Amino acid sequence: MNKLIELYCAICHHSEDSRIAEKMQHGSNNKSAQFTDVELMTAYLWGAQQGLLTRKSIYNFIRTYHLGEFQKLPSYQAFCRRLNRLAAAFAALAEVLFEQKLASSEPTHGYVLDSCPVMVSVGSRSNTAKTARDLCNLTRNPTKNLWYHGVKLHVFAQLRPRKLPIPCAVQISKASLCDLWAAKQIDLDCAPVADGRLYADRAYIDAEWRSHLQTERNVALITPRKRKKYDVLVSEDAVSTRISALRQPIEGFFNWL
C-alpha cells in the first residue's frame, strides 16, 4: 500500500511540470471529474508494475483489489477513452523521469544507439493487417527474415557499468523508416548525446553524419567496419566483436521492455 501511495504522490508532484500539465486534461470536462487524471495515471502504472500487460487486465485488477483506493473508478470504456487522451502526458512523464535518472547518474560518456521492431502482425497476416495504419506499416525484418506490420522503436541510451542503459531519447516510427534517417531526426530534434562515444551497428554508417556528430556534438560514432567481399582481416573481426559487446546492454534493455 505504501508503494501505491508513493506512486500517487510522485505523479501528483510531476504533474506540476509544465510539460506534463499542459498535456493533461485540465482544460477538458475531466477537470471536474470525480476520478482525476492523476488517479487514472496512478491506477494504470500501478497495474503495469504488477506485470499486467493489457488495459483490460489492469482495469480488472484495480476493480478487484483496489476499489477502496479508487472508489470513483469509471467504466472500462471511459477508462480506456481517457487513457487515450492522456497518451501525450504519459510520454511527457517518461521524459521527465528519464531526465531525472540521467541527472542523478554518474556520466559515463558512453552511449549506444539501436532500434527494435514492434510487431503487430507477422507473416501472411501482415499483408492484410489494418491495426493502427496511421502509425504502422509493412516492412521486412532482415534479422529475423520475416515480413511484419508494426512500428519501430528507436533509442539513444547512456551506458552504465553492470546495469541497463538509461534512455536519453526514445522515438516510435513506422516500421519501414530507415534506422539512420530516424537517428538523424532524433539528433536534430533534441541532440540527446554529447561529449563521448556512440556505439551503433552497421545500419548507422554514414560519413556525413559521423562528421556532424564529431564537430557539433563532440561525439565519436563507433561502428563495425563494413566487410568487403573476400575480406578476411581477423583484426577487424576483433573490433566488430568488441563493439557488439559494448552494444549488448541495449539488447538487454529491449528484452526488459
Which residue stretches match the model-derived regions?
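Short alpha-helical elements
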Residues: 1-257
